[in-house]
Amino acid sequence: MITEQNEKARKQIEFVCTDDLVPQDHLLRIIDKAIDWSFIYDLVRDKYSPDQGRPSIDPVTLIKIPFIQYLYGIKSMRQTIKEIEVNVAFRWFLGLELYDKVPHFSTFGKNYSRRFEGTDLFEQIFQHILEECYRFKLVDPTEVFVDATHVKARANNKKMQKRIAHQEALFYEEMLRKEITSDRAAHGKKPLKNKDDDDQSSGSSGGHDKFEDYTDDVPLDGKTIKCSTTDPESGWFRKGEHKHVFAYGIETACDKNGWILGFDVNPGNEHDSRTFKGLYDKLQNIGMEKCVVDAGYKTPAIAKLLLDDGVKPVFPYKRPQTKEGFFKKYEYVYDEYNDCYICPNDQILKYSTTNRDGYKEYKSCGHICEKCEFLGQCTASKNHVKVVTRHVWEEYMEACEDIRQTLGMKELYSHRKETIERIFGTAKENHGFRYTQMYGKARMTMKVALTFACMNLKKLAKIQQEWDLKMA
């Protein structure tokens, strides 16, 4: 039997309660129940005048608007406002009645630029939600997984100019310089001369590139980098073999249960190993015992940083980068007592020098190697001298190799796909994390903070709901 819809129902006048229109198991209802949103008032109280100006929009409502946007992965604030106008659940979550006027799409942007810009409000919101997860004893920070993903910036790839780049000091540069000087002195070598002031920048700990103003007169021998004229704070990122985009790098840490513990926003052209210190500083005093990272973080400086702090680095196996047909580095045995290397033909490679990068160079005797039957497998140098390098912090890398081969470490490393990689996949698929519609690092930080906050809160709310159902 066919039933025809009566269009008179569209104009039917009814007395309804907004709360009755939102299902009890709706996501926004269980999220609203999960935490007390009044904590936002304490965070923003100093950003409002107590007795001057017109009454403002409720700060909680103001923060919940972008929260809805990132929770549901809505493309823009303009589209978010349109969805709020017709979605009863969104109105209920914001505390709006059915006939209340929805704020204009520019309201949040104006409040951000006038009140919130230059503050750490959104990082505080993220931290408060994370503390709630700690309060329920859901977070286990003993094993921390760290990785980075890239978010496409709102920048035209064709609108760019070249800039002169002056690389800033790495976080370990001063410590490495002292180690090099000490090592050279132990071998009877003079200290290396300091580089020109133009080639170095002191007082930095992040390892970022510092740029001069736009210029057309780029020196042939100077390092240049492509910089967007639309969003200069983004970085030129190589995405795949033939594709490049302007992007931001989001370095993130989580525990073994998938709770996001911290993040750091950097230009997309910065390598993970250079930006690690910024994130690591935010993870101090959380009780971290193991730090699981991918091959991009496998450097002597990071190994030393973690081991000196009592944290076990869990690095993956990294195959040798030797050319095919040549001896691998591990085939040259290091004699710690005599401080030399022994080649596969039992010849000695003696210490030569320690370079600026912190590598000790061990060289063979060219006259002996010239007559060696393994010369074609050892070196292709014209003077027949084989050079093997060893970092001044190589013992830390050897300690990390011992940790890697410990029982259970391989299995622990395999959990990356279930933790940090799953977080990135979920954020990109469900929360609009593939690209950003915002300009600048500050606004990108806001987006990341609220996105990760809503992911933690969503997970917390669902766990609380399961507990309530079990206790019912």
Regions found by a protein language model. Give the residues of each.
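Short amphipathic alpha-helical interface patches used for protein-protein assembly/oligomerization
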Residues: 90-94
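Generic alpha-helical segment signature
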Residues: 11, 24, 37, 58, ...
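Anion-binding and metal-coordination hotspots
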Residues: 4, 66, 73-86, 96-472
